Amino acid sequence: MTNIRKSHPLMKIINNSLIDLPAPSNISSWWNFGSLLGICLALQILTGLFLAMHYTSDTTTAFSSVTHICRDVNYGWVLRYLHANGASMFFICLYLHIGRGLYYGSYLYMETWNVGVILLFAVMATAFMGYVLPWGQMSFWGATVITNLLSAIPYVGTNLVEWIWGGFSVDKATLTRFFAFHFLFPFIISAMVMGHLLFLHETGSNNPTGIPSNMDMIPFHPYYTIKDILGLLVMIMSLLALVLFSPDMLGDPDNYSPANPLNTPPHIKPEWYFLFAYAILRSIPNKLGGVLALVLSILILIIIPLLHTSKQRSMTFRPLSQCMFWLLVADLLALTWIGGQPVEHPYIIIGQLASILYFLIITTLMPLAGLLENRLLKW
């Protein structure tokens, strides 16, 4: 008799994706983040569902309903902080996952990479809309500033912004539709994740050497299930430490004041995971230019496979490219720091230099390093 997991139509899919999947024998812990992202998504959907049972998407009651969740709902505060800090863990895993892809040349699996970039956009949009829902000061002003950027689009900009707002300012209609989309998007993301995995399983996983590993594969279970559980434990412990000891560490104190359209906070800034893009946006004095730079800072990931000049796939044996990669990481950390600082000297010039360097490394320095390494190896 055939094993049910190999014959049942549904079990067969799970078996071929998580149990009998042939995986390279040498993939490191950097390959853990895919499964961690899946768990993050499940956690966000679950905590979000329970929060939505108590939340009201009306400007008069939204802030109070969040307060009610924290004070009166059984373990409501745990749900709320798991959801808020879960988003931070999601982005930490997301950025490390993308960094792994860049370092080891995983972007050469074009379909998987492109679906991943679209996923990144979808997750960022979802997180932004979620930040608006508590209807605190930073929620309101963040929504106003970021949606208002669309008015920079020539000819249709103003109409587009008013259409998104559902009126002439961020108001009740905006909050209601943001809640609707924030609830819907994670399910769309889940469907896209399946596409991401489908494309990945067409080619199989990359590995740290960047060399095809067809001749040396091992089953995913038990080897990588155990390895993923270790990563999961580390992530869950970190998340619980954050939630139970300093739940507000990554939030903004301004968001504990109810939204007031008549009072602008001194420093409007998004959550930490958007600060690098926000710094790039602010570094350009022109509105349209800033918006284009903001979009391109993420969209540039799409063209990375086209900028691959090296004859080796991975950076494991390419010291020059490694230097460029870590310079890019340092630059992104600098941009994140700048994004949280006020717009004044010397932060303005540092932000502008870091923004130029960001685009320069990706479009010029990394491809040049690849070409130079080819020459040094006489390839």
Curated annotation (Swiss-Prot):
InterPro entries the record matches: Cyt_b/b6_C, Cyt_b/b6_C_sf, Cyt_b/b6_N, Cytb/b6-like_sf, Cytochrome_b, Cytochrome_b_C_euk/bac, Cytochrome_b_N_euk/bac, Di-haem_cyt_TM
Cell compartments where the protein resides: Mitochondrion inner membrane
Molecular function GO terms recorded: metal ion binding; ubiquinol-cytochrome-c reductase activity
Cystine pairs: none
Cofactor remark from the record: Binds 2 heme b groups non-covalently.
Binding site for heme b b562: 83, 182
Membrane topology qualifier: Multi-pass membrane protein
Positions that bind heme b b566: 97, 196
Entry superkingdom: Eukaryota
Transmembrane segments: 33-53, 77-98, 113-133, 178-198, 226-246, 288-308, 320-340, 347-367
GO BP of this protein: mitochondrial electron transport, ubiquinol to cytochrome c
Subunit structure comment from the entry: The cytochrome bc1 complex contains 11 subunits: 3 respiratory subunits (MT-CYB, CYC1 and UQCRFS1), 2 core proteins (UQCRC1 and UQCRC2) and 6 low-molecular weight proteins (UQCRH/QCR6, UQCRB/QCR7, UQCRQ/QCR8, UQCR10/QCR9, UQCR11/QCR10 and a cleavage product of UQCRFS1). This cytochrome bc1 complex then forms a dimer.
Name of this chain's protein: Cytochrome b
Organism: Plecotus auritus (Long-eared bat)
Gene that specifies this protein: MT-CYB
